[in-house]
UniProtKB/Swiss-Prot annotation:
PROSITE patterns: HOMEOBOX_1, HOMEOBOX_2. GO terms for molecular function: DNA binding; DNA-binding transcription factor activity, RNA polymerase II-specific. CDD domains: homeodomain. This is Iroquois-class homeodomain protein irx-3. It comes from Xenopus tropicalis. Keywords: Activator, Developmental protein, Differentiation, DNA-binding, Homeobox, Neurogenesis, Nucleus, Repressor, Transcription, Transcription regulation. Residues 171-250, 387-410 are annotated as: Disordered.
Length: 448
């Protein structure tokens, strides 16, 4: 039996071949010679213990011979680390019969060491040299880890703790890292600190002026009262304007139109008054007025043009004559009424009767205003009706003019041709025929 890995080739059997149990020729005192037993005991326990063991005949319990001292020297387990271990050098490195808690085994030389005062002194020296930027790069961390025999995690943790400690002690001499720096750009430099200092100086300079302004405000309480009254008046005016906008938009339109007409009428008068010759000024003023008159209706017509429904503008263009008459601008109130009443749909007074409202098609409830032919024919006849019927504004006409006679004759002819128009705006007995005629008229207007 040989064990070359243990350092010896064979083991001699302790018991001889002629044992008492085997051969029965020898006695128990001849189991092993005294010299062999003493040699084995002396190699294991030392000379005094070996003599005592041999005297008491313990040779049967020692399976090793004198040539095989397995434990020649034993070091103490409780001495310094430099002393030899419990195991003999002849044995190979043992494999652990358990899994260690960490990633390193107990006797592994790569196991991280605790940070000692000597290892952290190197890190402190590097930190003192880089007080303005205490953020080591990856290469610097690797270099410091090799020098101090520490891991990268330990080095990074130490620097983080050092920066936190300096920050608590108000000994920061570096600019904090911004978000752009974390993305890979350069770290904060001295220029950023200068910018912060400049901002602080500007704030300190502004503090004095702010204090002076606050003192002036405290010394002059009347200014606050006046400002409050101004703001209140302004808010009241704004609120009143908003109320007027909600309630009376037509009044504002009237005011604007009247203002324009006053300006147009005052301009030629001023020009006439400033002229030196009275005789020359009068025809000039009359000429200016004549020039102003045809140009003024487009201004009036342009204002409500945006509010016209498309269907009524088409109806007007289809029914207007080739030479529409132009009424001179004699009064501002009549023109403003025309502006308001142009092309609007209003409810007929006949809607008060249930017979008119209960029909399937109530075309007679709506009255079409400011259509050229209808206004010419109905402006005279319907003014004679009572307050219950709809009244139509009539354009001012000059007295004793030939145009008025022709217009009246044309209106009489239209009334004879279209008798339905007299009954379209007031309740009559024959409703079915009137309903059909009104529907035909409205459909013709809409199609045109």
């Amino acid at each position: 039996m040989s064990f070359p890995q243990l350092g010896y080739q064979y083991i001699r059997p302790l018991y001889p071949s002629d044992r008492q149990n085997v051969g029965g020729t020898r006695s128990g005192t001849e189991l092993s010679p005294a010299g062999t037993l003493s040699n084995v005991l002396s190699s294991v326990y030392g000379t005094p213990y070996a003599a005592a063991a041999a005297a008491q005949a313990y040779g049967a319990f020692l399976p090793y011979s004198a040539e095989l001292p397995i434990f020649p020297q034993l070091g103490s387990q409780y001495e310094m680390k430099d002393s030899p271990g419990v195991q003999h050098a002849a044995f190979s490195h043992p494999h652990a019969a358990f899994y260690p808690y960490g990633q390193y085994q107990f006797g592994d030389p790569s196991r991280p060491k605790n940070a000692t005062r000597e290892s952290t002194s190197t890190l402190k020296a590097w930190l003192n040299e880089h007080r303005k930027n205490p953020y080591p790069t990856k290469g610097e961390k690797i270099m410091l880890a090799i020098i101090t025999k520490m891991t990268l995690t330990q080095v990074s943790t130490w620097f983080a703790n050092a920066r936190r400690r300096l920050k608590k002690e108000n000994k920061m001499t570096w600019a904090p890292r911004s978000r752009t720096d974390e993305e890979g750009n350069a770290y904060g430099s001295d220029h950023e600190e200068d910018k912060h200092e400049d901002d602080e100086e500007i704030d300190l300079e502004n503090i004095d002026t702010e204090d002076i302004e606050s003192k002036e405000d405290l010394d002059d309480p009347d200014t606050d009262i006046h400002s409050d009254s101004k703001t209140d008046a302004r808010s009241d005016s704004e609120a009143s304007d908003g109320f007027e906008d909600l309630n009376a938009p037509e009044d504002r339109l009237l005011k604007s139109v009247v203002g324009q007409r006053q300006v147009l009428n005052e301009e030629p008068q001023d020009k006439c008054a400033l002229s030196s010759d009275a005789k020359a000024s009068q025809p000039a003023c009359e000429q200016i007025k004549l020039d102003r008159i045809p140009s003024s209706p487009p201004l009036e017509n342009n204002i409500p043009a945006a509010h016209k429904p498309k269907i009524w503008s088409l109806a007007e263009t289809a029914t207007t004559p080739d030479n529409p008459r132009r009424s001179p601008n004699t009064g501002g109130s009549v023109n403003t009424q025309n502006l308001i009443a142009q092309h609007r749909l209003i409810a007929s007074p006949g809607s008060r009767f249930q017979g008119w409202t209960g029909r399937a098609f109530s075309a007679q409830q709506l009255s079409l205003l400011n259509s050229a032919h209808f206004l010419q024919g109905l402006s005279v006849s319907h003014t004679a009706l009572g307050s219950g019927t709809a009244s139509f504004p009539k354009a001012a006409e000059p007295k004793h003019s030939t145009d008025s006679l022709t217009d009246r004759s044309s209106t009489v002819d239209i009334e004879k041709k279209i008798p339905v128009l007299n009954t379209a705006f007031q309740p009559v007995q024959r409703r079915s025929q009137n309903q059909l005629d009104a529907a035909m008229i409205l459909s013709a207007l809409s199609s045109s």
